[in-house]
Amino acid sequence: MAKKIIGFIKLQIPAGKANPSPPVGPALGQRGLNIMEFCKAFNAQTQALEPGLPIPVVITAFADKSFTFVLKTPPATVLIKKAAKIDKGSSKPHTDKVGKITRAQAEDIAKTKMPDLTAADLDAAVRTIAGSARSMGITVEGV
């Protein structure tokens, strides 16, 4: 018989930098989960990724105090800002443009994000990424 699920916890944690301090400690502690066990497992799975890149994670907590977790792809906005080499998007996105990315960069981001996007193919995923970039005040060349 399957274990009884008592809840899901959604967090964004920098790759390789999970530690018991907030937000990880309080979120897991409320459900009675082993915080250090999660931190070690998360850091082990994300050590191949760029350190500090925020990684969304969904933790499934079970009634017997065990857990499983699923890593998602980094947020599109973080990848877009990194590609455009900017710190933050525009405060007036459709008026003030703060950077540019090429279609090739948008395709790379779309390939990275593909498992988490609902797009049917790569072209649709590129258009999704281009829309996110435009809403941040970043021009996408060739789309």
Curated annotation (Swiss-Prot):
SMART domains: RL11. GO terms for molecular function: large ribosomal subunit rRNA binding; structural constituent of ribosome. GO terms for cellular component: cytosolic large ribosomal subunit. One of its GO terms (biological process) is translation. InterPro entries: Ribosomal_uL11 (IPR000911), Ribosomal_uL11_bac-typ (IPR006519), Ribosomal_uL11_C (IPR020783), Ribosomal_uL11_C_sf (IPR036769), Ribosomal_uL11_CS (IPR020785), Ribosomal_uL11_N (IPR020784), Ribosomal_uL11_N_sf (IPR036796). Gene3D superfamilies: Ribosomal protein L11, C-terminal domain, Ribosomal protein L11/L12, N-terminal domain. Forms part of the ribosomal stalk which helps the ribosome interact with GTP-bound translation factors. This is Large ribosomal subunit protein uL11. The gene is rplK.
